[in-house]
């Protein structure tokens, strides 16, 4: 009966461990239980505990040894804890120590403090809804080392170079395993993925002559980088050197704060050229640096010797030293500005009299700045006035009529004759209208030069027209009567 209880308890332990349902106290309790109950023939592999799903492969061989009373007591505690866990609440366990000789140690009450063994901890909301989980090793993201995948990558050349270096190292350190080109191709095929793997698999390689690794790398350069390394490798390298020289010539440094970025770009292109040309490119590099370039070039010519002539790092070191000097000088200048000259009592007598004009400090009037208001002042909206921005009408009388022909074509309103105005009319003194015109001029009125104005003129005009009509009618009647008489 005891053996069946032990097996059942251990099986439940492994089942709960796989589902992350055990608390720390339950985990420690079951480990101690297995240590006490298992004999030397029983083996449990606990090395694979921090796996992905916390599933443990164990090899157990049960024996027919009797279980001690202490283990039965612990099993009873475990069964009660399982019943509580089935009810939906997390059980609370107290840490119980177990002696090898037998018997359990129950924590004793200290002076003034209740026993933790008998005291129940009050559950909080966090403990009920978010039960604590056993501490485990976090899952580590496994990355495939040495795998080449250049699908949709921008730095393809860097990836190919790193992969080729690793493949070459594997082949050279294990020459006995990679004597056959087939094995090398198999290794390269398993170390690639994507389009690179398809290239190695579908290409017919020359396995008799040449280095198979170099063939694969040259073909990758041709297919993925557009460099014709397979057919004309020398011409491609010469073309790269020419592009690097043009790039170094075009590089400029306008701000000394970008010295590191400028040096990195220049150095990357310089190492694509021949080693014998390095001193000339270093002098060109120093001539492009502002502020400290001349001093650094002078120091480089005096201090460089041997292999340091070909070293751009040596020149970078000199530039950093010159920059540190300028930085220290600027710090000292800032300190001198804060230095109070009045505190220094040791002064030499001036040897110049009247050489320097004393100048007073210019007074700058501080402009008044309106205080900021948090609220917007309310202004009453003014009533709309039409014609506010237009020129007002003149109150004087109308101006004289403009005669565009340059001569007086207007008709005089006194004598109704064209050729002169009313103020120049010779009949104005003898006529009553002339007296009216004189009185109007005294008041400030001017005559209107439009003809046929006034009641009298219109009447006269109509009267004259009627007289003319009657005369024409009489003439017509006379002509008609004469014709009738002739016909008779």
UniProtKB/Swiss-Prot annotation:
Residue stretches in coiled coil: none
Xref: InterPro entries: Caulimo_coat (IPR001988), Znf_CCHC (IPR001878), Znf_CCHC_sf (IPR036875)
GO-annotated biological processes: symbiont entry into host cell; viral penetration into host nucleus
Zinc finger (CCHC-type): 410-427
Keywords on record: Capsid protein, Host nucleus, Metal-binding, T=7 icosahedral capsid protein, Viral penetration into host nucleus, Virion, Virus entry into host cell, Zinc, Zinc-finger
Classification via SMART domains: ZnF_C2HC
Motif (Nuclear localization signal): 120-123
Stored SUPFAM superfamilies: Retrovirus zinc finger-like domains
Assembly: Interacts (via nuclear localization signal) with host importin alpha.
Single GO MF descriptor: structural molecule activity
Lineage start: Viruses, Riboviria, Pararnavirae, Artverviricota, Revtraviricetes
Superkingdom to which the source organism belongs: Viruses
Protein name: Capsid protein
GO cellular component, one term: host cell nucleus
UniProt subcellular location: Virion; Host nucleus
Protein family per UniProt: Belongs to the caulimoviridae capsid protein family.
Function summary: Self assembles to form an icosahedral capsid, about 50 nm in diameter, nm, composed of 420 subunits of the viral capsid protein. The capsid encapsulates the genomic dsDNA. Following virus entry into host cell, provides nuclear import of the viral genome. Virus particles do not enter the nucleus, but dock at the nuclear membrane through the interaction with host importins.
Keyword RNA-binding: no
Biased composition, class Acidic residues, residue ranges: 80-93, 464-488
Chain spans, region Disordered: 78-137, 463-488
Basic and acidic residues biased stretches: 94-129
């Amino acid at each position: 009966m005891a053996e069946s209880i032990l097996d059942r308890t251990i099986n439940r332990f492994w089942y709960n461990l796989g589902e992350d349902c055990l608390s720390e106290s339950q985990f420690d309790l079951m480990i101690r239980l297995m240590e006490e109950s298992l004999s030397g023939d029983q083996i449990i592999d606990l090395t694979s505990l921090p796996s992905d799903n916390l599933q443990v492969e164990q090899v157990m061989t049960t024996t027919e040894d009797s279980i001690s009373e202490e283990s039965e007591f612990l099993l009873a505690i475990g069964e009660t804890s399982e019943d509580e866990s089935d009810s939906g609440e997390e059980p609370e366990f107290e840490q119980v120590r177990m002696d090898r000789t037998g018997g359990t140690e129950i924590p004793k009450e200290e002076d003034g403090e209740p026993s933790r063994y008998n005291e129940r901890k009050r559950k909080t909301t966090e403990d009920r809804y978010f039960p604590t989980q056993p501490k485990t090793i976090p899952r580590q993201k496994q990355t495939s080392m040495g795998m080449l995948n250049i699908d949709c990558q921008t730095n393809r050349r860097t990836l190919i170079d790193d992969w080729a270096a690793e493949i070459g190292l594997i082949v050279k350190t294990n020459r006995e395993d990679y004597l056959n080109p087939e094995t090398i191709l198999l290794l390269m095929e398993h170390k690639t993925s994507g389009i690179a793997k398809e290239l190695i698999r579908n290409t017919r390689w020359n396995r008799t002559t040449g280095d198979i690794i170099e063939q694969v790398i040259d073909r990758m350069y041709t297919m993925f980088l557009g460099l014709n390394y397979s057919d004309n490798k020398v011409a491609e390298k010469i073309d790269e050197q020419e592009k690097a020289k043009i790039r170094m010539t075009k590089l400029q440094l306008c701000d000394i704060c970008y010295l590191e970025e400028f040096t990195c770009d220049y150095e990357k292109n310089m190492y694509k050229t021949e080693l014998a040309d390095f001193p000339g490119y270093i002098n060109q590099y120093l001539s492009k640096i502002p502020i400290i370039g001349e001093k650094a070039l002078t120091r480089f010519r005096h201090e460089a010797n041997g292999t340091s002539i070909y070293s751009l790092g040596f020149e970078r070191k000199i530039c950093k030293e010159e920059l540190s000097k300028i930085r220290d000088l600027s710090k000292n200048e800032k300190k001198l500005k804060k230095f109070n000259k009045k505190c220094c009592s040791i002064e030499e007598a001036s040897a110049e009299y009247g050489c320097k004009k004393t100048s007073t400090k210019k007074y700058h009037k501080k402009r008044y700045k309106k205080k900021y208001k948090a609220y917007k002042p309310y202004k009453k909206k003014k009533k709309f006035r039409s014609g506010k921005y237009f020129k007002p009408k003149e109150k004087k009388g109308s101006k004289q009529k403009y005669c565009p022909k340059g001569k007086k074509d207007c008709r005089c309103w006194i004598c109704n004759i064209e050729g002169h105005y009313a103020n120049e009319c010779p009949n104005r003194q003898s006529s009553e209208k002339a007296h009216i015109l004189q009185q109007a001029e005294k008041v400030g009125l001017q005559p209107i030069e439009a003809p046929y104005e006034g009641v009298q003129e219109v009447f006269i005009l109509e009267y004259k027209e009627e007289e003319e009509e009657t005369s024409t009618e009489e003439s017509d009647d006379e002509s008609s009567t004469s014709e009738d008489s002739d016909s008779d």
